[in-house]
Amino acid sequence: MATVLIIGASRGIGLEFVRQYVAEGNRVIATHRTPESGAALRELGAKPIVLDMLDEGAVLEFGEKMANEKIDIAVINAGVAGPRGQAVTSPGGLDFDAVMHTNVRAPMQLIPVLAPALIASRGKLAVVSSRMGSLSLMTNTASWLYRVSKAALNAALRTASLEYGPQGVVCIAFHPGWVRTDMGGGSADIDVKTSVEGMRRILALANDSSNGKFINYNGEQLSW
């Protein structure tokens, strides 16, 4: 039985990660932002923990809670889309802060505090990023603030792989596909079950050679 930590588990991809890992008999710790959103996680059999990723003190306190854990798999899934559209326009300060703090700053705060628990088990760390964050695959201007945030998240994950890979932690950035969630919309390509099954399959097979890679849910390696 593995110990699995899902950050941002109240709905969508995060909730499906919880559902599938619990169904396999794993011990799952799942974070959510508000007390009300923990009920569904508890019913699934996970251990819910309230965590506001934008609260630096809360992140440090959470790290203390994890200090005695051995985490086999940690998935940082929390994220926001921000303004949509094709136009390259100046982002407002509130939009910029909301997207960059949630998608970049929060994971950068979390990764170092989770590292000891991952190192202890030679575990695996994944961030749910997006193909839209790839510089080499960029072909349009849609959602440019979101793109920038995911490019920064990719850089953070790649940097973490250089720090923690030599200590036995496999670090991966995922493109989950275009998924039918609140963020992806109803016309997206795949359902959340298919996306998470693919990412879980990759995590199960991941080894030292997977460290620092950017991988599609279907196993395709993506360029940064």
Predicted features and spans:
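N-terminal Rossmann NAD(P)H-binding glycine-rich loop of SDR-like oxidoreductase domains
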Residues: 10-22
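Rossmann-fold cofactor-recognition segment
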Residues: 43-57
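Conserved Rossmann-fold cofactor-binding substructure of NAD(P)-dependent oxidoreductases
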Residues: 53-69
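C-terminal helical subdomain
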Residues: 166, 173-176, 185-224
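Conserved glycine-rich Rossmann-like NAD(P)H-binding loop of the short-chain dehydrogenase/reductase
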Residues: 21-39
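Catalytic loop of short-chain dehydrogenase/reductase
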Residues: 80, 84-100, 108-109, 119-165
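Structural signature of the Rossmann-like NAD(P)-dependent dehydrogenase/reductase core
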Residues: 6-7, 76-77, 124-130, 170-175
